A protein has these predicted regions:
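Extracytoplasmic gate region of multi-pass secondary transporters
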Residues: 32-33, 229-287, 340, 344, ...
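Helix-breaking motifs and short loop linkers at transmembrane-helix boundaries and internal kinks
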Residues: 44, 76, 97-103, 114, ...
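Conserved MFS/SLC helix-loop-helix module at the cytosolic interface between two early adjacent transmembrane helices
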Residues: 63-102
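Helix-to-loop junctions at the C-terminal end of transmembrane segments
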Residues: 64-76, 283-295, 382
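Cytoplasmic membrane-interface "Motif A"-like loop-to-helix N-cap segments
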Residues: 73-85, 291-304
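Cytoplasmic helix-loop-helix junction between adjacent transmembrane helices
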Residues: 107-145
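Helix-loop-helix hairpin linking two adjacent transmembrane segments in secondary transporters
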Residues: 142-195
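C-terminal transmembrane helical hairpin of 12-TM major facilitator-type secondary transporters
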Residues: 296-346
Length: 429
C-alpha cells in the first residue's frame, strides 16, 4: 500500500507543480534575452539602468514572501497560486507593450510582487504531501522548473527575438501562465484529505506518517521564535550569498555569451541552454543521493565550492579565452543548481510545521534580496568594465561565503545525521 501511495502522489502532484513553477521562472528569466536583443536601445535605457530594471523583479519578490507564505500555510495554497498565475501572466505579457522606462520598471517590480509567494507556497504544499525521506527529491522536481525552463526558454526566446522581436517574446511567454491557472484550479487539492484519488486508508497512513515526523521536532510557539533561531539566521545569510551567484549568472548569461562569442541570437540561445542541461542532471543526482544517504548539508556546500572554483578559474583566464570560460560557466551553472533539493529539505526537518513555512519564506526572501544584488551588480560590472571578468570574481566570492555559512549551521543532535553535519562535541541548535 505504501508503495502504491507513494507512486500515485508522485504522478498526480509532481507534474502539476513542475509546470507551475516552470511558468513562473520563464517570466522572470526572459528579460536577459530582451536585454541582449535591443530593449535598451529601443527604450533608451543606459547600461546602469538596465541592470537596475533587470533586478527590480527581485525587490518586489523580497517584500511579499512572508505574507504569502502565512496565507498559504493558514488558508490555501490552491487559491494563492491560482491568482498568482493569472496576475504574473498578465504582468509578463504587458511587458511586451511598454513604451517608456517608468512603465517597464513598474511592471518588473509588480511581476516580483505577484510571484513572491509561489516558491514558499509550493514548499508548504510539498510538506503537506511528502515525508521527510522523500522531500529532497520532491523539492528537486519543483525546482527543476528553473533549469529545465531556462534550457528550452533559451532556445525559444532566442528564436522569438530573432524572428519577431522582444515585444512578441514577452507576450507569447506571458499568456501560458494565464491559461494554466484554469488547469491548476481543477487539478489541485490543498491536503491529502481532500483528494478523491486516495483511498481512506491511504489518507490515514499519510497523515499518520507526517504527524509522527512533527512529534520528533522541537516545538516552537510562533514565527518570532523561529526567525530568531541561529540556524534560520545563518540559512538566510547563506541563501542571500548563494542567490547572488545564481541570478547574476541566470539574468546576464545571454549577454555574456553573445558579447563573448560574437554569435547571433539563435546560437546564443543554444549556448545559453547548455548549462541548464548540466544543472538538470546534477540536481537529480544530488537529490537522489541526499535522500538515499539521509544527508542534507553534505550535498550543499561541496557543490557551491565547485561553483566558486569555476568562477574563480574564469576570472583567472580573463576575457581572451571565451570558450574555456564558457566550459567553466557550464560547470558553475550545474554546481549552483545541484543543491536546491537538499537545501530546502533542511528547514522542515529543523522546525515544526506551524513555523516552517514562514521560515522558508524568510529564507527565500533573503534569497530574493541576494538575487537583486547579484542581478544588479553583475550587470553593472559587465557594463562598467566591458567584460564579465570582474563579475566572475564577485560571484565566486559570494559562493565561498555561502559555503562557510552552510558549514556553520549546527543542527540539533537528533537531526545531525539528516543534515550530514560532523559530530564534534555536543551538538546544539
Amino acid at each position: 500500500m505504501t508503495a502504491n501511495l507513494a507512486a500515485r502522489r508522485w504522478w498526480m502532484i509532481m507534474p502539476i507543480i513542475f509546470i507551475t513553477y516552470s511558468l513562473a521562472y520563464l517570466d522572470r528569466a526572459n528579460y536577459g534575452f530582451a536585454a541582449a536583443a535591443g530593449i535598451n536601445q529601443d527604450l533608451g535605457i543606459s547600461k546602469g539602468l538596465s541592470s537596475l530594471i533587470g533586478a527590480l523583479f527581485f525587490l518586489g519578490y523580497f517584500f511579499f514572501q512572508i505574507p504569502g507564505a502565512i496565507y498559504a500555510e493558514r488558508r490555501s495554497v490552491k487559491t494563492l497560486v491560482f491568482w498568482s498565475l493569472v496576475l504574473w501572466g498578465a504582468c509578463a505579457a504587458l511587458t511586451g507593450v511598454v513604451s517608456n522606462i517608468p512603465s517597464l520598471m513598474a511592471i518588473r517590480f509588480l511581476l516580483g510582487v505577484v510571484e513572491a509567494a509561489v516558491m514558499p507556497a509550493m514548499l508548504i504544499y510539498i510538506s503537506n504531501w511528502f515525508t521527510k525521506r522523500e522531500r529532497s527529491r520532491a523539492n528537486t522536481f519543483l525546482i527543476l522548473g528553473n533549469p529545465v525552463t531556462v534550457l528550452w526558454m533559451s532556445v525559444v526566446s532566442g528564436y522569438l527575438v530573432h524572428e519577431f522581436g522582444w515585444r512578441h517574446m514577452f507576450i507569447a511567454e506571458g499568456v501560458p501562465a494565464i491559461l494554466w491557472a484554469v488547469c491548476w484550479w481543477f487539478l489541485v487539492q490543498d491536503k491529502p484529505a481532500q483528494a478523491n484519488w486516495l483511498t481512506a486508508q491511504e489518507k490515514r497512513d499519510l497523515d499518520a506518517a507526517l504527524a509522527a515526523e512533527q512529534a520528533a521536532i522541537k516545538p516552537m510557539r510562533n514565527y518570532g521564535e523561529a526567525f530568531r533561531s541561529p540556524a534560520v539566521i545563518k540559512l538566510c545569510a547563506q541563501y542571500f550569498c548563494w542567490s547572488i551567484g545564481v541570478y547574476g549568472f541566470v539574468l546576464w548569461l545571454p549577454s555574456i555569451v553573445k558579447n563573448g562569442s560574437a554569435l547571433g541570437m539563435v546560437a546564443t540561445g543554444w549556448l545559453s541552454a547548455l548549462p541548464y542541461l548540466a544543472a538538470t542532471i546534477a540536481m537529480l543526482a544530488a537529490s537522489w543521493a541526499s535522500d538515499r544517504l539521509g544527508s542534507r548539508r553534505g550535498f550543499v556546500w561541496p557543490f557551491l565550492l565547485i561553483g566558486a572554483a569555476a568562477f574563480a578559474a574564469s576570472y583567472a583566464l580573463g576575457s581572451t579565452h571565451f570558450w574555456i570560460s564558457y566550459a567553466l560557466l557550464v560547470v558553475a551553472g550545474a554546481a549552483m543548481y545541484a543543491p536546491y533539493g537538499p537545501f530546502f529539505a533542511i528547514v522542515p526537518e529543523l522546525l515544526p510545521k506551524n513555523v516552517a513555512g514562514g521560515a522558508m519564506a524568510l529564507i527565500n526572501s533573503m534569497g530574493a534580496l541576494g538575487s537583486f544584488v547579484g542581478s544588479y551588480f553583475v550587470g553593472y560590472l559587465n557594463g562598467a568594465t566591458g567584460s564579465p571578468v570582474a563579475s566572475y570574481a564577485f560571484m565566486s566570492a559570494a559562493l565561498v561565503a555561502a559555503v562557510i555559512l552552510t558549514l556553520s549551521v549546527k543542527p540539533q543532535a537528533r537531526d545531525a545525521q539528516t543534515l550530514g553535519a560532523p559530530l564534534q562535541g555536543k551538538m546544539h541548535q
